[in-house]
């Protein structure tokens, strides 16, 4: 099995479940969130690295290793933020990105022109 470096932005319900499953599969997972409380809980319960900060910040993504990531997953509660995080991750060198988007009118933003 090929193990990946995966960065997950958003340590909410979806992000924490993804982090748990992916770390169980032995992927190298880094969680990014603004909430130190959530990250502390995840850090204590899961085999993950954590970075506290704004996932839409270039500096925070660099600290979290976006430039070396095989996959960046953005699953915060804000569609626009998820798209922005993925755009930044891709520009920094992430091989693949996935943005959680519920508003289908925003889908065109991430499509290649």
Task: Describe each model-derived feature in a short phrase.
Residues 22, 89:
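Aromatic pocket-lining residues of Rossmann-like dinucleotide-binding sites
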Residues 33-34, 111:
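Conserved acidic E/D residue at the C-terminus of a beta-strand in Rossmann-like folds
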Residues 54-58:
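Conserved SAM/SAH-binding loop
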Residues 105-113:
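Residue-level detector of conserved catalytic or cofactor/ligand-binding positions
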Residues 15-16:
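N-terminal Rossmann-fold NAD(P) dinucleotide-binding loop
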Residues 11-12:
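Glycine-rich Rossmann-fold phosphate-binding loop(s) that bind the pyrophosphate
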Residues 39-40:
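Short alpha-helix immediately C-terminal to the canonical SAM-binding loop
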């Amino acid at each position: 099995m090929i193990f990946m470096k995966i960065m997950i932005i958003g340590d909410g319900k979806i992000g924490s479940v993804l982090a748990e499953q992916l770390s169980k599969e032995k992927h190298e997972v880094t969680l990014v969130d603004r909430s130190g409380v959530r990250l502390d809980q995840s850090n204590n319960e899961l085999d993950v690295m954590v970075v506290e900060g704004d996932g839409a910040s270039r500096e925070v993504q660099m600290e979290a290793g976006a430039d070396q990531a095989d996959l960046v997953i953005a699953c915060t509660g804000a569609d626009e933020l998820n798209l922005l995080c993925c755009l930044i991750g891709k520009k920094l060198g992430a091989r693949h990105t996935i943005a959680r988007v519920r508003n289908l009118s925003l889908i065109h933003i991430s499509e290649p022109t």
